């Protein structure tokens, strides 16, 4: 993708010495570079190592906010103050909804009258009900290449290569997201907490892996899901329940990690 955008790319294999970030920074310095730019990896130890090595080599470091989260570190500082001893998820969730005007009516109140519809997310899955079918992406060049690479370079590692169930391209990821919106979103809220023996998906989105690796951004997922909800009369317990997983939990846990991660280790 980057090459298609005329970006010069140097690919570092996992078995190369430069796959160690400290060794890579040694190489960067030896080639005369005095400035590097990175996205925040949201990794306490990795950030420390990068900063320490850059200081050692007098390399200027410019850290950009990660597009994989809605909040910047500066945004999080308002809620996750060092002086606080306790952080409550519900308080954070409400503040995010208000600040971003997400599912808020013209009077500044939560749509539907409640901040959370968690109590409506606990229905049992109907006996005999067949869950919506998920269209697993077909095996493609990227999956085949990755499997061959893994077999060749990690022969002694545990596990085995089998059916790969996730999208690996932007187009596949968008199609996967659309499939959730069109076929599972409507009843997501009712069966969010349901468990059925021998079923692994039910009405869930399975979007976390795609957001975690950057194939979908949380901002895009939030905006598109809310827009779809309005146009298709998705129940409020489904819309709010889905939004809560991203801005109420994913962002909250990132904030906890950023503020207290080293302490919690």
Residue ranges, per PLM feature:
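Glycine/tryptophan-enriched, flexible segments
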Residues: 100-243, 253
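Beta-rich, aromatic/charged-enriched effector core domains that present basic-aromatic interfaces
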Residues: 22-166
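An acidic- and aromatic-residue-enriched active-site/binding cleft used to recognize and process polar
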Residues: 14-17, 41-43, 66, 251, ...
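A residue-level signal for conserved active-site and pocket-lining positions in enzyme catalytic cores
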Residues: 36, 214, 246
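Flexible loop/turn segments at secondary-structure boundaries
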Residues: 17-19, 44-46, 71, 218-219, ...
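Histidine-anchored nucleotide/phosphate-binding helix
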Residues: 1-3, 19-26, 225
């Amino acid at each position: 993708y980057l090459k298609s955008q005329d970006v010069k790319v140097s690919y570092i294999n996992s078995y190369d010495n430069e796959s160690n970030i400290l060794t890579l920074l040694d190489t960067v310095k030896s080639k005369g570079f005095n400035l590097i730019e990175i996205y925040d990896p949201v990794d306490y130890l990795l950030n420390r190592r990068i900063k320490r090595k850059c200081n050692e080599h007098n390399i200027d470091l410019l850290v950009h906010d990660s597009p994989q989260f809605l909040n910047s570190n500066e945004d999080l500082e308002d809620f996750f103050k060092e002086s606080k001893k306790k952080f409550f998820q519900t308080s954070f969730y409400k503040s995010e909804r208000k600040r971003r005007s997400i599912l808020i009516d013209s009077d500044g109140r939560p749509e539907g009258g409640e901040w959370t519809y968690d109590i409506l997310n606990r229905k049992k899955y109907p006996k005999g009900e067949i869950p919506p079918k998920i269209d697993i992406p077909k095996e493609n060049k990227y999956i085949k290449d990755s499997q061959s690479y893994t077999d060749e370079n990690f022969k002694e590692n545990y596990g085995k290569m089998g059916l790969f169930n996730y999208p690996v391209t932007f187009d596949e990821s968008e199609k996967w997201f659309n499939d959730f919106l069109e076929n599972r979103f409507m009843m997501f809220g009712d069966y969010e907490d349901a468990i059925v023996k021998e079923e692994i998906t039910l009405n869930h989105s399975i979007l976390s892996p795609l957001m975690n690796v950057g194939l979908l951004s949380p901002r895009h997922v939030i905006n598109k899901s809310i827009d779809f909800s309005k146009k298709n009369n998705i129940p409020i317990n489904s819309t709010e329940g889905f939004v809560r997983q991203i801005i109420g939990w994913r962002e909250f846990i990132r904030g906890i990690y950023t503020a207290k991660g080293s302490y919690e280790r």
